[in-house]
Amino acid sequence: MRTSQYLLSTLKETPADAEVISHQLMLRAGMIRKLASGLYTWLPTGVRVLKKVENIVREEMNNAGAIEVSMPVVQPADLWQESGRWEQYGPELLRFVDRGERPFVLGPTHEEVITDLIRNELSSYKQLPLNFYQIQTKFRDEVRPRFGVMRSREFLMKDAYSFHTSQESLQETYDAMYAAYSKIFSRMGLDFRAVQADTGSIGGSASHEFQVLAQSGEDDVVFSDTSDYAANIELAEAIAPKEPRAAATQEMTLVDTPNAKTIAELVEQFNLPIEKTVKTLLVKAVEGSSFPLVALLVRGDHELNEVKAEKLPQVASPLTFATEEEIRAVVKAGPGSLGPVNMPIPVVIDRTVAAMSDFAAGANIDGKHYFGINWDRDVATPEIADIRNVVAGDPSPDGQGTLLIKRGIEVGHIFQLGTKYSEALKASVQGEDGRNQILTMGCYGIGVTRVVAAAIEQNYDERGIVWPDAIAPFQVAILPMNMHKSFRVQELAEKLYSELRAQGIEVLLDDRKERPGVMFADMELIGIPHTIVLGDRNLDNDDIEYKYRRNGEKQLIKTGDIVDYLVKQIKG
């Protein structure tokens, strides 16, 4: 490709509304342009990267035995009503009617469509297992699209769905997809972790996320410092303290705390160790309960894990925190004065709280706290559960080492769905015994556009993007200095351009009438891994300057050796 025949829309300045580095660099490198909130046009450089990602995904999915299909973006509402997700999905599901007043949705995912297809196409267990995938546009009406293509409303996704007659068969395909995803992200040169995860609104049982480690990530990824254990923070188990509860050394006393509405204020005003405080959060109880609310207690320096809390049998789903009005109607005190003593509703305490002694908590009286509370002496020990987020330094749940926490960008997610959708849509085949058998399903997603942004978040410097070779828009940049004035430079540039292309190497020849500084800056911004610079001074010695983008190292290579050198660098 020649720059004179290419749209090289680079920007010198960083757009003001671009928050994260990938968004900034994708705009500056001329990869994307914003059309509307959460909607982006992909320019030629961006499309080249996108296609590289797609091709790797497609190759590994095919190698794993998956079959490619293509399903409509627009889906009839009746399928979503049949599955029960019409009500469950909420405002992220864009709903509309056609001219015949028939309701439709723009697909955020395709479980319903593929299940409908399979229930009409398959009839016998002999046709299974099968795994179908597509690389298709999705739309989710995000309340606040941000970070460029990292959290956009329209995006490209690889979604796959497998169908089985047994859990064992599903497990085989699930393991194959796990391995395929590991190959995909390894081939792309990404530093990632596969972590245990919650199934969320998709549903099902087992689930793993593939997280690219990056400071800008929205997820907390938890992993052991000595073993292979890794999990999303939502799912990571907080192990109960090994040390037995210390004996009481204080009497419980009622203390006036009129200006301490938060744990931070209580700690500061009364010089308490935060580890000796407990915070009490009230949430709505499950429908049909004899109590409207449930009290959840965690240590003052810990955070409630809402995913774990929502799974408690007495807690309503989705998890809903009580309003101050609802709290006062039940407890007769405000949110800043709540605690376990004389709490008139069911209480669930975290494992760490169960191990505490001589602690401080609200007295369920406005402006008052109890200090020196001890379980079983001052209040009976309530139900104990793991309801907090783990913190760095906690013991690993597998018993090996301690936990580290890093930020991650979710680029892939695999689920064992079980029979959630096949039961709802009555997708079955004739089993080996001649009876109808509901299908068991798995689903497997990769955010193709998000992968591009995640790769940049891991691979950049002060000059621009530093692409991993496998997904770079071009492999080699040829920068001829003053080629429009030097016939020798121009002739060699054209010769090398042809020879490299003949070797199957993707080349960008910068044949613009631009200053060398502009040419260098653009190529480094775009992030092309290998650059060769042709100039009369070096050519006097039959030399060409080669520069590797990742480490910035330069070297002189003889003109006759440069093609072989580049082929070896790129193809090994």
Swiss-Prot record:
**Main site of residence?**
cytoplasm
- Tell me the function of this protein: Catalyzes the attachment of proline to tRNA(Pro) in a two-step reaction: proline is first activated by ATP to form Pro-AMP and then transferred to the acceptor end of tRNA(Pro). As ProRS can inadvertently accommodate and process non-cognate amino acids such as alanine and cysteine, to avoid such errors it has two additional distinct editing activities against alanine. One activity is designated as 'pretransfer' editing and involves the tRNA(Pro)-independent hydrolysis of activated Ala-AMP.
What is the designated name of this protein? Proline--tRNA ligase
**Alphabetic keyword roster:** Aminoacyl-tRNA synthetase, ATP-binding, Cytoplasm, Ligase, Nucleotide-binding, Protein biosynthesis
Source organism (scientific name): Escherichia coli O17:K52:H18 (strain UMN026 / ExPEC)
Similarity-based family: Belongs to the class-II aminoacyl-tRNA synthetase family. ProS type 1 subfamily.
Enzyme class, broadest EC rank: ligase
Which one Pfam family would you cite for this protein?
tRNA_edit
